[in-house]
Amino acid sequence: MKAAESTKHKFNSNWGAFMEEGFTPKIVGFLCNWCSYNAADLAGAAKVEVPSSLSVIRVMCSGRVDPVLVATALLRGADGVLIAGCHPGDCHYREGNYYARRRFTLLKETLETLGLDSNRLMLAWISASEGRRFGEVTNEFAQQIREMGPNPMKQKTSL
């Protein structure tokens, strides 16, 4: 094997390990306007550590998160998606979080059918006063995704 080919071979065979070593998961968070978004705001005001790679999308209700948006986020490069809403029984729109829970269950099944680990999707109930809990949930989810590695779907698609 020539020196140039050897270097190229080493580069290619070690690239995956190198990338995962410094892997910072990209997480998209769909946060309920009435509870979870306010918890994120409170976490920031209290200087609670949250993943720097968390991209927040404010939605009026967790029950209004379109499954197509979740799938699109994963296909376009998100390593994980968090849907966070009010605790059951506390929804500003009465039953929105129950809709979210049903959609979440179906979405997880769909992801598994497509060959993607459904643990890349998380549903959490976080009230407006739970800034610390917001930090805990997002950091635990980021660690879970970090252990899973990069989203394999983003490598297979070219959107």
Listing of model-derived features with the role each one plays in the protein:
Residues K2-L159:
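Iron-sulfur-associated redox domains of electron-transfer enzymes in respiratory
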